[in-house]
Regions:
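Surface-exposed, charge/polar-rich loops and edge strands
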Residues: 2-345
Length: 345
């Protein structure tokens, strides 16, 4: 097989198919079901998911919670408006941030937010233009202040404001730290999860804090030259054991979302099995890379030329993936973060 090029993953997407708001109710989104056995494509609704699961299967979800990490403030003493997007915690109250306007936020710049009970000072400018910023606040934790003043960092292609911040949060989100939602999980409702469990299907949790690198376009023509961003993950002993037991019993491990998938595949590649651990991963799954853990995947429809569509092609096959996307456009599926879902089994 020739070295794959970025342009191999291009497809034409009419703008109107980019979903601007989530389906309501959540599980009323559509579900394209792709069979690895017979290459069939079925068109279903997300709440039909349990019909495709078998007793003994294990769904693995990412319980990371999105930080309302976009905060707009006022530069002191000039009064100029500026914006910070918290990307990751460096240490204590120091965070790596994306700053706008970056050029005007030199080291030593002080910014105040809301009623002034949250302030920030720029400590350092990094090579890529990001800033190290230290925050000062009057509450127990910075998170309380972000809840008060922050907004969800929606992807750039979503232009509509959310009616409710929780729309960009999965119903099982609990570990704060993501800059973007693990979107495949947005389709689940508590009732659907009950139905799945009642069928004898397990649901286990991992944590991977989604970085904004997930939206970073691939710059290189040859995809193998692309350098992946790094993200923090954690797998508990309980989850690791459930995954090992599922595999040993000959049942399927189905990742909900590319983030859960990357967590499991990173750990399986590193240790040869799934074990309890935490760390950072920059695993890049593209056609030709072998999968060592997952048997299936629930995911959304991803951007052309993104590392995520490359991951789908790695799992399902390049030609079949590009064909499925062509069908999705013809059938007017809704795309990207608030869009419809795909199940590969």
């Amino acid at each position: 097989m020739h070295n794959m090029l970025k342009k191999d993953f291009w497809y034409d997407l009419p703008k109107e198919l980019i979903a601007q708001e989530p389906a309501s109710p959540r599980d009323s989104a559509r579900l394209m079901v792709l069979s690895q056995k017979d290459d069939s494509i079925q068109h279903k609704i997300f709440r039909d998911l349990p019909d495709f699961l078998e007793p003994g299967d294990l769904l693995v979800v990412n319980n990371s919670k999105v930080l309302p990490a976009r905060i707009v403030g006022i530069k002191q003493p000039t009064g100029a408006v500026c914006e910070l997007l918290l990307l990751r915690q460096v240490k204590g109250d120091q965070w790596e941030c994306l700053a706008k306007p970056g050029k005007r936020m030199q080291v030593g710049t002080k910014v105040s937010f809301g009623d002034g009970s949250l302030t920030a000072v720029v400590d350092e400018t990094l090579e890529d233009g990001n800033k190290f910023v230290t925050f000062y606040y009057d509450t127990e934790t910075l998170y309380e202040k972000l809840d008060e003043f922050g907004k969800m960092p929606l992807p750039p292609y979503i232009t509509k404001q959310l009616e409710d911040q929780s729309q960009y949060q999965t119903v099982y989100a609990k570990e704060l730290g993501s800059a973007a939602a693990p979107t495949a999980g947005l389709h689940f409702t508590p009732e659907l999860m009950d139905t799945i469990r009642a069928k004898g299907v397990g649901i286990a949790e991992v944590t991977l804090h989604v970085g904004l690198g997930t939206f970073r376009p691939v710059q290189e023509d040859e995809i193998t030259d692309h350098k992946m961003h790094s993200e923090w993950y954690s797998i508990s002993e309980e989850t690791a054991q459930r995954i090992r037991d599922t595999k040993a019993a000959g049942h399927r491990v189905i990742a909900v979302g590319t983030t859960s998938c990357r967590t499991l595949e990173a750990v399986a590649a590193k240790y040869g099995e799934i074990r309890a651990c935490s760390g950072t991963t920059s695993i890049f799954l593209y056609p030709g890379v072998k999968f060592n853990c997952i048997d299936g995947l629930v995911t959304n429809f991803h951007l052309p030329e993104s590392t995520l569509i490359m991951l789908i092609a790695a799992l399902y096959g390049y030609d079949k993936t590009m064909h499925a996307y062509k069908v999705a456009v013809e059938e007017k599926y809704r795309f990207f973060s608030f869009g419809d879902a795909m199940l590969i089994l």
